Amino acid sequence: KGEKYNIKPIRKNNTKSSKKSAKADLEELIGLDEIKSEIRKILNYVSLNKERGKMPTLHMCFYGNPGTGKTSVARVIGKLFAEERILPGNGDFVEVHGRDLVAKFVGWTAQKVHEVVGKAIGGVLFIDEAYSLISRGRGGFESEAIDTLIKEMEDHRDEICIILAGYTDEMKELLKENPGFESRIQFNIDFPDYNHVNQSILVFD
């Protein structure tokens, strides 16, 4: 029987493999003071609500240009959520591009999205260039990918943190593509550009 399609290579790492704590990793991110402050607030908010038996949705949207630290921060978030037992896994981090979620034939896209999400259950699914899911009249199966992704975000809201990332304007356009995103994305984080001094020491994506 065999699979109907081949998913493009997916980066999957265990973010707990480092001997350092997640909080130490967070503090070592250079040039991201405002972002680190936001992550601490998110961690406190989620931990407090979990203690009260009101586990919030963990899904996020990262806005910013390439090289502003989005991937690095997403990895740290995965490790934080694992160490704090917010997510049930071991800090697994799966990274894909938005275009990787769209298949070429009818009915395959939903299965593809489901399989990718399944690989990240218990950890973080980081979807870079998520705005490539905007159909723009191309006649593909982008809408099917979005509909399936939104359903997966709801069905596994306590088991996974899905992070959508990309350029600010394009990401805002994506979120308007389907109103279901708004109720499922709990946290929005802006990643500013850096001057030449900060860029020389920043840990790039």
Enumerate the language-model features and the residues they cover.
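Flexible beta-alpha connector loops of hexameric P-loop NTPases
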Residues: 98-109, 132-143, 189-190
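Short glycine-rich substrate-engagement loop in P-loop NTPases that contacts/grips substrate
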Residues: 90-120
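Conserved AAA+/SF3 P-loop NTPase catalytic/coupling segment centered on the Walker-B
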Residues: 121-150, 156-163, 170-176, 196-200
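Walker A/P-loop
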Residues: 56-91, 115-118, 185
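N-terminal accessory segments that target, anchor, or regulate ATP-driven/P-loop NTPase machines
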Residues: 1-17, 157, 161, 168-169, ...
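A short helix-turn-beta junction within AAA+ P-loop NTPase domains corresponding to the substrate/partner-engaging
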Residues: 176-193
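Conserved small helical "lid"/interfacial subdomain of P-loop NTPases
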Residues: 191-205
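Pre-Walker A (pre-P-loop) alpha-helix and adjacent loop at the N terminus of AAA/AAA+ ATPase modules
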Residues: 21-60, 79
